[in-house]
Design a protein with these regions (language model features):
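N-terminal redox-cofactor-binding region of secreted/periplasmic oxidoreductases
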Residues: 2-8, 12-665, 680-696
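Polybasic, lysine/arginine-rich low-complexity segments
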Residues: 668-669
């Protein structure tokens, strides 16, 4: 056992590594200031009758959009969030390590979705936790800030007409814009052997991106062990080439070692804005439409506090922006009459727009892990050794309590599979047979979209340097098997299996049917099997092997392909990254939104969340969702910049002639009638392009 671990085991963890940083103060976590920072949140349910923008979902993307769009004081913004504020459980949100030991999963702050039984995963129903609180899943997740690769982002941009807006240069700038990066403390960097490049980061954004204030010594063995089995260290994992081994940045505020999430980053530091209202405990029940020039137009949004409660309606002057996530956004579209015709009719919903792709192309990262006993202290064993009673845990963070798992590697197909070129060709050749048997839709458009995603994955991604398997070191899993354990996880990054979600009721409070079709394509089973073999090999490689004792799961008896496949079908789980259910694809390929994020057939409804990604990235989705939301805000503002400028001029003129006549922003309408947004040209137009260029500032 390492001496440092022996020492720490005998010391109260509140006093461990009590570094003073004083960097990047976050007023949200100054509890004396918190009351001042609640002023954009509506606690009594009183809102105006209409808003320019109604954002559905106050999660990761929704609060970014609310903050950015309300920067224009002549624009009114409302956020409707189904969950509560989270203030009653703030310590469980704020303290990073509580995501493992004292989390909100399974509480009223978790949507607690569940898949239907998965035939290729031992007929199990698999839990899908999602954050039901201001901040959404950014308030309960593992805080990884891992970006996709340049190749993946450019591949996304290539799938849709005029998709160059979403190319790497633009998304890279948007992800940098979202963050304030702080390098690791010197002792943390030395312990973990962290490599990074300042040039890949932003230093003035709302979200804090940093590292824990304390580092477990086993993390320092991570990259050397991977190097010893021919996986290189990534010197700049956030710069577009994020394959190889590294220690990931995390959404941690190093001023006080707390979680940085969309609420604490984008909303609470704001001064009071009369043009911004955030209404918690407001579940959107449907979007209200009317026929107008330019297509079906959203005129309002209905919402209720809970099932059976009286519904209220708020009018929309400009746009409805769905940011309810990969489950919520397609469900809201479907109960509003936008989706596959057969699904809507079966659920008793009047069809407004028959759009077959809504809820289709659903993808997720699936993971399993190999676990060993260890004679060394782990973060989990240290925590439970000091806090056996969770009623006595601290309510403020410390450097040790900021420790979360962050040792990562992205391993490509060629490092996992024997004869990779041959097997990749077999996968590519199977596109038609896979499409004819595995697509859960009767619509030809959805089948064509499946083929497009399949071909891109097989031909552009599979044999590239991009990691097809994420490998993670877990030092927080004490209690599941033994008091002291270490796990190495493998998570499939580019699944060939695609599923769907759909409604079977017109009632938004009835959960949709979620069917990711895990492991339905045999290639996924083979790759995850080989990923687990890689985990076992890594755990038996020095210097990491010094920490490993007996392998207890799956155990040494699991050796053959068949044994591995049987075991992983019984022991694989979501990595909490559902996406692609409102895919940005051509409508002819089952797409739901165009390159401007606008829903096909609707004049003024957009989707801006992880559901629009057309395929899974080799990354955690938090960083690209922040980038997506930053870019979406610029895109939306660019759409209306001329109209808003005219309104501002008109308002200034009226103000100068009658200075005592004031109108509250909450009741202001920017136009007497609903505005139909102009469609941006292929190049987005000079005005919108200029607005997007501001992302780089």
């Amino acid at each position: 056992m390492r001496a440092v671990s022996l020492f720490l085991a005998a010391v109260p963890l509140a006093s461990v590594a009590g570094y003073s940083t004083g960097r990047h103060p976050d007023a949200y976590h100054d509890f004396h200031e918190r009351e001042l920072l609640r002023r954009n949140i509506v606690y009594d349910g009183s809102i105006a009758s209409s808003y320019d923008y109604v954002i559905v979902g106050g999660g990761t993307a929704g609060l970014v959009l609310a903050s950015r769009l309300s920067e224009n004081s002549n624009t009114s913004v409302l956020v409707l969030e189904a969950g509560d504020t989270g203030e009653a459980v703030q310590d469980k949100i704020d303290i990073p390590s509580y995501t493992y030991y004292n989390s909100l999963v399974g509480s009223s702050y978790d949507w607690a979705y569940e898949t239907v039984a998965q035939p290729d995963a031992d007929n199990r129903q698999i839990s899908w936790p999602r954050g039901k609180v201001l901040g959404g899943s950014s308030a309960i997740n593992g805080m990884y800030l891992v970006r996709p690769s340049e190749l993946e982002i450019n591949a996304w941009a290539s799938l849709v007409p005029n998709g160059s807006i979403w190319n790497w240069d633009n998304m890279y700038a948007a992800m940098k814009k979202s963050e304030t990066y702080t390098p690791p403390l010197s002792n943390v960097q030395d312990t973990a052997k962290i490599e990074y490049s300042n040039s890949s980061h932003g230093f003035s954004g709302p979200l804090h991106a940093s590292y824990p204030g304390y580092m477990m010594p086993q993390v320092g063995d991570w990259t050397p062990s991977l190097n010893n089995i021919d996986i290189m260290t990534s010197p700049n994992p956030d710069g577009g080439d994020g394959w190889g081994a590294f220690v990931a940045t995390s959404a941690i505020n190093p001023a006080n070692w707390t979680r940085s999430y969309s609420r604490s980053a984008y909303i609470d530091p704001l001064p009071p804005r009369a043009n911004l209202a955030i209404l918690p405990n407001a579940t959107v029940t449907r979007i209200v439409f009317a026929n107008a020039t330019g297509g079906l137009t959203a005129t309002g949004v209905q919402y209720a506090s809970q099932k059976g409660a009286t519904e209220s309606t708020v009018s929309v002057n400009k746009e409805v922006i769905l940011a309810a996530g990969a489950i919520g956004s397609p469900q809201i579209l479907m109960v509003s009459g936008v989706g596959p015709q057969d699904v809507l009719e079966a659920a008793g919903v009047a069809v407004q727009v028959a759009l077959p792709g809504v809820g289709q192309h659903l993808q997720d990262h699936l993971y399993a892990e190999v676990t060993w006993k260890t004679n060394e202290q782990t973060a989990g064993s240290m925590f439970y050794g000091n806090y056996s009673n969770l009623n006595d845990v601290p309510t403020t963070s410390t450097p040790f309590l900021s420790f979360i798992n962050s040792a990562t590697a992205y391993v490509n197909f060629s490092a996992l599979i024997a004869a990779p070129e041959t097997y990749a060709q077999q996968i590519a050749d199977a596109v038609d047979s896979s499409a004819s048997t595995l697509v859960p839709s009767q619509y030809s458009e959805v089948v064509e979209g499946y083929k497009a995603i399949y071909n891109l994955t097989a031909q552009k991604l599979l044999l590239s340097s991009i990691g097809d398997m994420e490998i993670l070191l877990s030092l927080t899993g004490a209690g599941q098997y033994e008091p002291q354990v270490i796990s190495i996880q493998a998570a499939l990054q580019h699944p060939f299996s695609q599923g769907r979600l759909y409604i079977n009721s017109s009632d938004i409070f009835e959960y949709p049917i979620i069917d990711p079709q895990y492991l339905s394509n045999n290639a996924d089973l083979v790759m995850l099997r080989e990923g687990l073999r890689f985990c076992r090999s890594l755990g038996n490689t020095a210097p990491l092997s010094a920490a490993m004792a007996e392998e207890i799961s799956p155990g040494s008896s699991v050796q053959s392909d068949e044994q591995w496949e049987t075991w992983l079908a019984q022991n694989s789980y979501t990595e909490y990254h559902p996406s692609c259910s409102c895919a940005m694809l051509p409508q002819s390929q089952g797409g739901v939104v165009d390159a401007n994020l606008r829903v096909y057939g609707l004049a003024n409804v957009r989707v801006a969340d992880a559901s629009v990604f057309p395929f899974q990235f080799s990354a955690h989705l938090q960083a690209p969702v922040y980038g997506l939301a930053e870019q979406a805000a610029e895109l939306i503002r660019g759409t209306y910049v001329n109209a808003d400028a005219a309104n501002a001029t008109s308002s200034a003129s009226a103000s100068s002639s009658a200075p005592s006549a004031t109108t509250s922003a909450s009741s202001r309408k920017s136009a007497a009638t609903v505005l139909t947004p102009r469609v941006l040209p292929a190049a987005l137009g000079a005005v919108a392009a200029a607005a997007l260029a501001a992302i780089a500032l």
